[in-house]
Design a protein with these regions (language model features):
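C-terminal amphipathic helix plus adjacent low-complexity
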Residues: 346-413
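Nucleotide-activated donor-binding/catalytic signature segment of Leloir-type glycosyltransferases, i.e.
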Residues: 225, 261, 265-282
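A donor-sugar binding/catalytic signature common to diverse glycosyltransferases
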Residues: 22, 104-106, 282-328
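Membrane-helix interfacial anchor on the cytosolic side
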Residues: 440-461
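Nucleotide-sugar-dependent glycosyltransferase catalytic domains
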Residues: 2, 30, 37-46, 50-227, ...
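Nucleotide-activated donor-dependent transferases that construct or modify glycoconjugates
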Residues: 1-12, 21
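Short amphipathic alpha-helix
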Residues: 15-28, 40
Length: 464
């Protein structure tokens, strides 16, 4: 029997995948202590884990501040997490000494979980609730200008805040070492190797176990007419305008529609509903998806994974950079289409496209079979029990960094040659124009070379 400490932030999308893993570990005879928050108590205690409340360490917020949490920046969130870590210092110090965990299983963005595992030198496994991201897979993320600005200008603020941790025994090299996982960190990712972008670029410290779900039900699409399910998740779901457009778009179609709107809006604000459309605050999403023929989704990792697990094709409506990455990958495998126009006509057209073309359903079904062939919660539990795991010795990212150095040298040589040619044959007067022109024309060449190097290294990584 091992003693395992679970840590997570107060978020459904991060907590939910950890619950079946906790249940599996308890069933295997391990003692699990789950440090979380009161809104998750019931779910956690159902797994058999011991629930430890951490609500008193959260900042006190008025109603307006709670509402603004939906729009909080990554910088503000990181600073808040650092301050929560400091508030929890004395409490967790006593807990670690009393419980003496053999392993820490922590959400990837739960600073107090990571930092205390390092501080007390306890083997750590990281729960990754979305894709595993490195310098290759992060190319899938499409950040807004505001998100990019926040990253650039926020790093110095976070670095300054991190220094407040040092007197308490928390030693962090830099911000990235805290928020990102390298190839020597044991990580569980709740998807398959086939669905994970650039999965070959991750060492065997990463275990791709497939979606973490309790349900054993299978897809059952046999109905009198198609069922369309709509949900915007649990965070950015205050979208009455969007739901109204969905209702107007689908009310006259020969389909049934279920909308899960959360508790952010009053259902009555959506007006009188046609007979074929029902609106609920919450539903059993897996059960609905097992019957649904199409899913309009915000593209949270859990929602997309559950949809694919139940072989349901999607209309993608991502709201954040990470959600766009998930949508982009699901579109690549042919399991749906992007909603580029959220007007009434745009929604109607997108739903008809998914329902009329059975290739989307076939692609989703193929992915479903792939997910169900993964090791699942049993594989995750075994991985945690055996932490720390050993590497196979090949560090793909180390090779990528070497290749990137070569790429940068070649890129700038080509750019300089183009600048000289521009100056000799056209004009030296506007050197900045020459520089931009050179950069634009040499970039495609450089990217093609870079992709070729990555492909070569990926073959080496997989032994081909």
């Amino acid at each position: 029997m091992k003693k395992i400490a679970f840590f997570c932030i107060p978020a459904h999308g991060h907590t939910n995948p950890m619950l079946p893993v906790a249940a599996e570990l308890v069933q295997c005879g391990n003692k699990v202590r789950f440090y979380s928050f009161e809104e998750f108590r019931e779910k956690i205690e159902k797994t058999g884990a011991e629930f430890i409340s951490c609500d008193r360490f959260l900042p006190e917020l008025n109603e307006k501040q709670k509402e603004n949490l939906k729009n909080i920046s990554q910088t503000e969130m990181s600073i808040q997490d650092i301050r929560i870590t400091l508030k929890m210092n004395d409490f967790l110090e006593k807990e670690f000494k009393e419980f003496q965990p053999d392993v820490v299983y922590t959400d990837s963005v739960c600073f107090w979980g990571k930092l205390n595992a390092w501080k007390f030198n306890v083997p750590m496994v990281v729960s990754t609730s979305t894709f595993a991201f490195n310098q290759l897979s992060s190319q899938y993320i499409k950040n807004t200008p505001a998100e990019l600005a926040d990253m650039i200008f926020g790093l110095p603020k976070i670095s300054k805040e991190l220094k407040t941790l040092e007197p308490y025994g928390y030693h962090v090299k830099n911000t990235l070492s805290l928020v990102q996982n390298d190839n020597s960190t044991d990580c569980i990712v709740y998807t398959s190797e086939n669905f994970q972008p650039y999965s070959e670029s991750f060492s065997d410290h990463y275990r791709f176990v497939g979606p973490s779900v309790f349900s054993k039900i299978l897809p059952n699409k046999k109905k009198d007419r198609p069922l369309v399910y709509i949900s915007m998740g649990t965070v950015i779901n205050d979208r009455p305008d969007f739901y109204k457009n969905c209702i107007s778009a689908l009310k006259d179609m020969e389909i049934d529609v279920i909308i899960s709107c959360g508790n952010a809006i009053d259902k009555s604000s959506l007006g009188e509903l046609p007979e074929n459309i029902k609106v609920y605050n919450y539903v059993d999403q897996l059960d609905i998806l097992s019957k649904a023929d199409a899913f309009i989704t915000h593209c949270g990792m859990n929602s997309v994974s559950e949809s694919l697990y139940m072989a349901t094709p999607m209309v993608f409506y991502p709201q954040t950079g990470e959600q766009y990455a998930v949508a982009r990958r699901a579109k690549e495998i042919g399991a749906g289409e992007m909603l580029t126009d959220d007007s009434v006509e745009g929604i109607k057209k997108a739903v008809k496209t998914i329902l009329d073309n059975k290739n989307y359903a076939r692609s989703a079904d193929k992915c479903s079979k792939d997910f169900r062939s993964c090791s699942g919660t049993a594989g995750a539990a075994e991985f945690i029990e055996n932490a720390p795991n050993k590497s196979n010795g090949y560090d793909f990212l180390k090779e990528v960094n070497k290749a990137s150095g070569k790429f940068n040298i070649i890129y700038w040589i080509v750019a300089c040659i183009l600048i000289v040619l521009f100056g000799v044959f056209i004009t030296w007067k506007f050197t900045w124009i020459a520089g931009v022109t050179a950069g634009v024309f040499s970039y495609p060449f450089g990217r093609a070379m870079q992709k070729k190097m990555y492909k070569s290294m990926a073959a080496k990584r997989s032994g081909k």
